[in-house]
């Protein structure tokens, strides 16, 4: 975090205490010795397991060294890499772990350990609900498994610890990226990787030779190749719903930056290009839920923008243009959903996938949930289910942790929504755009997750938790420290145009 300078009455400048001050235990002499010995041992053991393992270990040590020297680079890496690769299969390159999990478990944890003791962002209600949600998901699920004497397999462990990786990602971003400039760079890094994701989805939809097979191998799924209906792109994700949820956030964030004129993140044409490309890729998923959600979110942002008429006309024209361009694909999907014959068509006027979900909930999951509302059934699948996918975030939460987990989820979403609403008029354009994006995402997710599992799958949750971290700490935290310095020294605040010299003495003795 950049230092805040103040001017004393005698004209001298000093540096005020900041969140970057203090010693972290990983920067002590003993910690360096421990790290050197541990890194050497890790590389040596990896070398005995094979060349690929040794190279991976060496790269891991190099990344750790870079993060130790420049923690902000580690945070940028998490922001730029984790969301777009969250759908890749496990084993790239660490066995049994996905690339995003490896990055969060290494860089994310390391960033939290590097945080200055006593100077990390203060915990808000959202943080407490979030850690409570992560702990409850793991604790209640493990208790359910132990009560049935069921083993905790790797699959169950992944579900138990999944929310914890989201919390680590959130706190690592919040703790490390503390300045406006850092948050602007992070927003840029969050959007730019969506370009190759969108291009891969479009090329996959066009059946460009080699692309479908490449993505099938990278995600360990054949769903695009084996789908018998209309072609639905999955991109670098295992399912089109995951891709749709990721692009849904990209579109909302990009439009929010545009209407808030956040040109410091990217030029208007670049932002518009990213949004249009993501919109086209979103349509290739042929998933009505994220497409409808993005449409509503963009229109809401346009209605609140200034000048309103110009933005409404622009967004409406773009929506109409994309709808006309992809009308044949959307029409085919519409016919699939609304021309179902009995017994597939149970309730008139509802699409077939809604009818199917209602049937699954009423016949498969509700009988199980009625007996396990207090603590849930657990992360594993109940026996004797003919269809094991819950098809709803709320059903998933009730199944994994019962009403307590659902309550904690509602608490973290509500507290973040209130904070985002309060910051939707923030003077900083980027922070305002993030706040508006989060508020819209939370409101729309209430309805969208009735029939989707966005909050626990790949794509959406990683973008969501990164944006929560980029919302930043309370702005009153730094003025309090600066105010304390001013009160203690009788200093005056620097003029807006003043620039501090390159090196100044610290108020505290012995530090420069």
Protein language model regions, located:
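Alpha-helical transmembrane segments of multi-pass inner-membrane proteins
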Residues: 3, 29, 60, 138-141, ...
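N-terminal hydrophobic segments of proteins, predominantly signal-anchor/transmembrane helices
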Residues: 65-167, 445-446
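Membrane-interface helix-loop-helix junctions at transmembrane boundaries of multi-pass membrane enzymes
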Residues: 71-73, 113-129, 257-273, 307-312, ...
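Long extracytoplasmic/lumenal interhelical loops at the membrane interface
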Residues: 215, 330-404, 420-427
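Hydrophobic transmembrane alpha-helices and their immediate junctions
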Residues: 295-299, 401-446
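Transmembrane alpha-helices of multi-pass inner-membrane enzymes
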Residues: 298, 437-446, 453-498, 502, ...
